[in-house]
Amino acid sequence: LALSGPYRLGFRAPVSCVPINTMIFNKPRITAVLGPTNTGKTHFAMDRMLAHSSGMIGFPLRLLARENYDRAVAAKGAGKVALITGEEKIVPAGARYFLCTAEAMPVDRAVEFVGIDEIQMCADPERGHVFTDRLLNARGGGETMFMGADTIRPLIRLLVPGVEFISRPRFSVLSYSGERKIIRMPPKSVVVAFSAGDVYAIAEMVRRHRGGAAVVMGALSPRTRNAQVAMYQAGEVEHLVATDAIGMGLNMDVDHVAFAALRKFDGHRQ
């Protein structure tokens, strides 16, 4: 640009310009959708992503990425949807939608929508650096969405200027049913245990007394894990035994939740 008089403006050479209405009025939207479990946050984010021409969501669990990959494939077709986790990588040449674990997100790829699920994992001692990096740096060209617990609200407000908060109420009502023996649990029950040994021991007990149980935990291979979930969801067994990772948004048809213990050793302390 060159000024050739007090009020005249001229161009010395062609320059690349962004229309002012795009710069001011079409600023990419950043939202934080917060609330407890069973509020439809992930479902809402998936709908928003699929409404865009391209998108990417980072999940805390491989099984959650796989579950939503299957949903996206049903909506958009296998040729447009990619799955990227530490164990599985399905990336068609024409992929437009990417369902990933947070660590495996191809963050150098430009997409219209970016979502990060369970963003309160920023506070996790082992994985928090990944989720914090995504909070600070992962952005969609048209829309960015963070989903998680309301406890993360102050941190997001501090670190993400211009963020819009959306609160989601729980769909179901929780009630305490008291103590109950494992062998007397009703159908559509899940027992949550805090170690692989406890998961296998409880699953074997349920199988002996109730005829069958599915097992879900991260240590299983992707094929085995997916088969166990499918077996439960299809009604082939009425009980599920899992680690507490199942609480990170995995969508299961469960009416009753029981904890095998009330204290957990996280590798450092009880």
Placement of each model-derived feature along the sequence:
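Conserved RecA-like helicase motor core of SF1/SF2 enzymes
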Residues: 218-219, 234-238, 244-270
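Walker B catalytic acidic pair
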Residues: 117-119, 261
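SF2 helicase motor core recognition
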Residues: 42, 102-110, 135, 240-258
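Conserved strand-helix element at the start of the C-terminal RecA-like helicase core
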Residues: 54-65, 145-146, 185-206, 213-216
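Conserved ATPase-coupling elements of RecA-like P-loop NTPase cores
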Residues: 108-110, 120-132, 250-253, 269
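Conserved motor-coupling elements within RecA-like helicase/translocase cores
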Residues: 87-98, 223-239
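Post-DEXD/H (motif II) to motif III coupling segment of the RecA-like Helicase ATP-binding lobe
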Residues: 121-173
